[in-house]
């Protein structure tokens, strides 16, 4: 019975190690690089700094928040 327990423990450990995805290269793990690729609304060319929002024609192009 102890051999079966040892075998079961080894199998469970191996399965647990292979089931965990190693996704260290995903953008969520590298926020600094993700922020370099992202254009924030404040730097968007159509952002209205006085009203602190984007005109409606700019909203489909990723400028947020929209002046409604």
Curated annotation (Swiss-Prot):
The modification 4-hydroxyproline is found at residues 55, 65. Residues 20-51 form a propeptide. GO terms for cellular component: extracellular region. Expressed by the venom duct. InterPro entries: Conotoxin. The modification Cysteine amide is found at residue 67. Its main location: secreted. Keywords: Amidation, Disulfide bond, Hydroxylation, Neurotoxin, Secreted, Signal, Toxin. Transmembrane segments: none annotated. Pfam families: Conotoxin (PF02950). It is found in: Secreted. Residues 1-19 form the signal peptide. Disulfide bonds join 53-67, 54-63, 59-66. GO terms for molecular function: ion channel inhibitor activity; toxin activity. Intracranially injection into mice does not elicit symptoms. Belongs to the conotoxin M superfamily. The cysteine framework is III (CC-C-C-CC). This is Conotoxin mr3g. It comes from Conus marmoreus (Marble cone). The lineage of its organism: Eukaryota, Metazoa, Spiralia, Lophotrochozoa, Mollusca.
């Amino acid at each position: 019975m102890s051999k079966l327990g040892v075998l079961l423990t080894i199998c469970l450990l191996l399965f647990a190690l292979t089931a965990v995805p190693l996704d260290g290269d995903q953008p969520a793990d590298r926020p600094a690089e993700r922020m370099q690729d992202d254009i924030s609304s404040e730097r968007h060319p159509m952002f209205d700094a006085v009203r602190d929002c984007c005109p409606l024609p700019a909203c489909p192009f990723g400028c947020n928040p929209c002046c409604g």
